[in-house]
């Protein structure tokens, strides 16, 4: 084994790497009681949609002595959907993802591990909409940073898929699925994933609400609703199972899938934003097979019979004034992956 395989090459191969990761809808989201750690036990079916985030991680020119409190200075730019709402600071999951890979690069003695970086996010997923836009940023950043700092796939120091999944779970419950893509059943906080085989393509109209909803706030509202009606609360893991939904997905039957969409967070989301009920009604009147609050909301995902139907439903909901914006998408979509590499030139 060569020295470069152990310690890494002395110079970077790529100036920048761009990766993409897709958003998601929860076709089934069963929520158990709050655990001692504050999280809730989930039983969910994720499906990746064609809406995606693209994240570019680029090395910056060396800038001499660096502040030891900030050994990897980072600059930012964001474009695309809701770009003005994206935090451009260390609270951003993409930044945390890059920092995690930089730590591995330092441990592996990668020569450019302490170089400054520029992160650019091109957004295609609504912010704070329950479709895992921030988690997709993190997943794409993990893939891009891994390729940037560990360009040799043969390197034993390069993090493998299992290690990336562990890092992803530390970043957020939805990040592992955004790495995986496709369709999967998630348990625990949603990070324990079992891929689900499906047939066909599913078409969606998406309705956003610019007011957004805080995920912790929606879970808190669910807990309060259950405390007020304890007879309706699950005693252990979520009552009910998504097995029938999995069967419908395997058969590729959108009409049957529509009957089986479940989201325990829909009621608390509607109680916080009552106008969501009107959006759901407008979707039904426009001819959607079914409509559901996506994740913790407030985005509404409307399952349609075809791509043309999705356009018609999105248009009808928009014309009715029941959404801040509408768009169409399809599912399932692929795993996170590299889409562009810019090599360093002499």
Question: Language model features by range: what are they?
Answer:
Residues 2-129, 147-157, 199, 208:
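ATP-binding N-lobe of GHMP and related small-molecule kinases
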Residues 181-252, 257:
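Anionic-ligand binding region
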Residues 2-7, 19-21, 97, 103-106, ...:
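Glycine-rich, charge-dense phosphate/pyrophosphate-binding loop(s)
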Residues 154-213, 274, 291, 301:
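Alpha/beta catalytic cores of group-transfer enzymes, especially the acyltransferase/condensing modules
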Residues 29, 53-57, 174-178, 184, ...:
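Short beta-strand scaffold segments in enzyme catalytic cores
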Residues 63-67, 73, 156-162, 215, ...:
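Short, conserved charged micro-motifs
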Residues 94, 129-161, 177-181:
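DPxDG-like acidic metal-binding loop motif
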């Amino acid at each position: 084994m060569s020295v470069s395989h152990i310690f890494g090459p002395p110079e970077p191969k790529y100036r920048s790497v761009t990766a993409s990761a897709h958003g998601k809808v929860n076709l089934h989201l069963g929520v158990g009681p709050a655990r001692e750690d504050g999280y809730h036990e989930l039983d969910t079916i994720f499906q990746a949609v064609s809406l995606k985030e693209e994240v570019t991680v680029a090395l910056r020119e060396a800038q001499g002595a660096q502040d030891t409190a900030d050994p990897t200075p980072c600059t930012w730019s964001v474009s695309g959907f809701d770009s003005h709402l994206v935090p451009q600071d260390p609270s951003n999951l993409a930044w945390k993802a890059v920092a995690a890979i930089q730590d591995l690069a330092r441990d592996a003695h990668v020569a450019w591990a302490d170089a400054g970086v520029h992160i650019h996010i091109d957004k295609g997923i609504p912010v704070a909409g329950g479709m895992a836009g921030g988690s997709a940023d993190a997943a794409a950043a993990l893939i891009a940073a891994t390729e940037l700092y560990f360009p040799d796939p043969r390197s034993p120091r390069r993090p493998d898929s299992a290690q990336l999944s562990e890092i992803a779970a530390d970043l957020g419950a939805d990040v592992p699925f955004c790495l995986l893509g496709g369709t999967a059943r998630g348990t625990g906080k949603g990070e324990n994933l079992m891929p689900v085989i499906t047939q066909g393509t599913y078409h969606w109209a998406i309705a956003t609400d610019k007011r957004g909803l805080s995920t912790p706030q929606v879970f808190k509202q669910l807990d309060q609703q259950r405390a007020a009606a304890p007879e309706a609360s699950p005693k252990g893991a979520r009552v009910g199972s998504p097995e029938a939904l999995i069967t419908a997905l395997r058969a590729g039957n959108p009409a049957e899938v529509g009957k089986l969409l479940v989201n325990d967070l829909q009621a608390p989301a509607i109680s916080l934003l009552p106008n969501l009920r009107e959006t759901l009604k407008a979707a039904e009147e426009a001819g959607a097979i079914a409509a559901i609050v996506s994740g913790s909301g407030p985005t509404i995902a409307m399952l349609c019979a075809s791509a043309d139907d999705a356009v018609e439903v999105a248009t009808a909901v928009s014309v009715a004034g029941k959404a801040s914006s509408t768009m169409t998408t399809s599912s399932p979509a692929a795993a996170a992956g590299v889409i562009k590499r810019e090599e360093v030139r002499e």
